[in-house]
UniProtKB/Swiss-Prot annotation:
Protein name: NAD(P)H-quinone oxidoreductase subunit N
Function field: NDH-1 shuttles electrons from an unknown electron donor, via FMN and iron-sulfur (Fe-S) centers, to quinones in the respiratory and/or the photosynthetic chain. The immediate electron acceptor for the enzyme in this species is believed to be plastoquinone. Couples the redox reaction to proton translocation, and thus conserves the redox energy in a proton gradient. Cyanobacterial NDH-1 also plays a role in inorganic carbon-concentration.
Annotated GO MF terms: oxidoreductase activity, acting on NAD(P)H, quinone or similar compound as acceptor; quinone binding
Keyword Cytoplasm: no
Transmembrane segments: none
Protein's membrane topology: Peripheral membrane protein
Domain of life: Bacteria
Enzyme class name: translocase
Species this chain originates from: Trichormus variabilis (strain ATCC 29413 / PCC 7937) (Anabaena variabilis)
Cellular component GO terms held in the UniProt record: plasma membrane-derived thylakoid membrane
Assembly and interaction partners: NDH-1 can be composed of about 15 different subunits; different subcomplexes with different compositions have been identified which probably have different functions.
Organism placement in taxonomy: Bacteria, Bacillati, Cyanobacteriota, Cyanophyceae, Nostocales
Family statement: Belongs to the complex I NdhN subunit family.
Subcellular location: Cellular thylakoid membrane
Amino acid sequence: MALITTGNGLIRDLEKFGSVGVYVPLEGGFEGRYRRRLRAAGYTTLQFTARGLGDVAAYLTGVHGVRPPHLGKKSSGNGAAVGNVYYLPPIVGSQLEHLPPKSKGLVLWIIEGHILSDQEVEFLTDLPKLEPRVKVVVERGGDRTFRWKALKDTFSASYQAV
């Protein structure tokens, strides 16, 4: 990798495919540089981890219920012993509503994406088709250099055969 990269290749492929899978060096730092270049190109980025995400489709596009960690305490009410359910708005919809007027769109940068199932990755691949202002970057694994390819090309071999 060059010392100074413009990130134009990643931005071009992200606009072309809508979603890309990236392989990043394990020492880190590269994703921050590319996110900065995406912001400079006019995109708003939202980074979150795939761990504990649950139902990806419900989390991103639908109203979904969450329970706070109970930390060993139990509620004394008639409800569940692990606490109340709080309902949150869809992440994608609420972020798109608050985009700046001149923004090109929203880029969801999902770290630790190697734990996602192929069905979840398939939904993330189709998400830019459902909402054209949304682009998706999923970290699919580690490598010696920062590289990327279309997210649909990162499915496991057994899933592609089906």
